[in-house]
């Protein structure tokens, strides 16, 4: 192709870019079309059911957003067409309650709901918090249990064989109304009596293939609710999750506290680092708890950056803190190499207040909920992406006390990495940060095959720049199909 003028070249490029946008939107529209042609069991709201009892006993008011999204879900599930909805919301915006209400609505109609979590730590936490939130509504089959209740079960890769056998039987005979688990739910031998709803937590950890694998466990196509706390700019949502309807929770529940974030340069301001450890001592003396996060487990781990040999590891930080500035505190250590039982035990101790400060890797990034934690120090913060830092900091300020997040770094003041950290310190708006993140990264990373089920590298199309083109392509794709 040899264009005769700059204008002709520009027009040709525009045309090729549009072709790429259209091909992608056709793929998503086809998925959507296939989904819409399916039929499923409508799940109608039942008066006097578990959901109504649950709502009447809630110790707090639902936010306007939670009620609105709840209505959208209720309307979806009444239909004979399976719900296919993405629920995105800021860290701590109360997505789990919305999902739990949907699960109860399905149990009320005689169906079962499955909650798929990305890690065992998160699955175990969901199991504990949902069981506690439901109270006697989760006591079906137990001695002295309520006759107006369901059974909540947990299934992960490390569920011991005898317990696993019992849980599988309860899933198969339908006595387990709410099934919480990890990838283990996708394995052979897990058979549901009537799987009516799948809730996938933290979407970016699961590919399309895994969503589809769980759907095959149902006799009729189940309703699907996908939750993510990583806010997604609208065009990315249209591009990556174009086959899903989108609901957004923007307001935080009452009682949530603000989070302040500061960047600390370790080399230029070493006394500020000492002050960070003092701040943890002060918070603990007031009865609060703290996190210290590092990017790697051992100092010996290489990450391809030879100039950063001194990078912090959780093991070296744990030794330094327990022998130095935090030696008077009860300090715990949590990372991915521990067994599931150890991870669960440590998280439980921290949640119960038996550990003052938890030194951890990003195991704690998603969903960990300890309202008493008020301060987080992130070592080598430049090693984390914007959305990861936003997720991590969302672990503090979850209760009535304000949260503080301190980002430690040694990078150059003028570097792109420092720009990222300053952006996180400036804003607590996840949607704004998601756009900054997208500006800084190649879009191929955002549209990974693991996320979209489509090819991972866009050649010409740029998600933010070509926003209006993507919208046009979406309209055309819908018309073509």
What label would you give each PLM region?
Residues 42-88:
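Conserved pre-motif I regulatory segment
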Residues 90, 118, 203-205, 216-239:
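Conserved helicase ATPase motor motifs in RecA-like P-loop NTPase domains
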Residues 147-149, 155-179, 187-195, 340-357:
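Conserved motor-coupling elements within RecA-like helicase/translocase cores
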Residues 170, 184-226:
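SF2 helicase catalytic motif II
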Residues 243-312:
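Conserved interdomain linker/interface between the two RecA-like ATPase lobes of SF2 helicase motors
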Residues 268-289, 309, 313-481:
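C-terminal helicase module of SF1/SF2 nucleic-acid helicases/translocases
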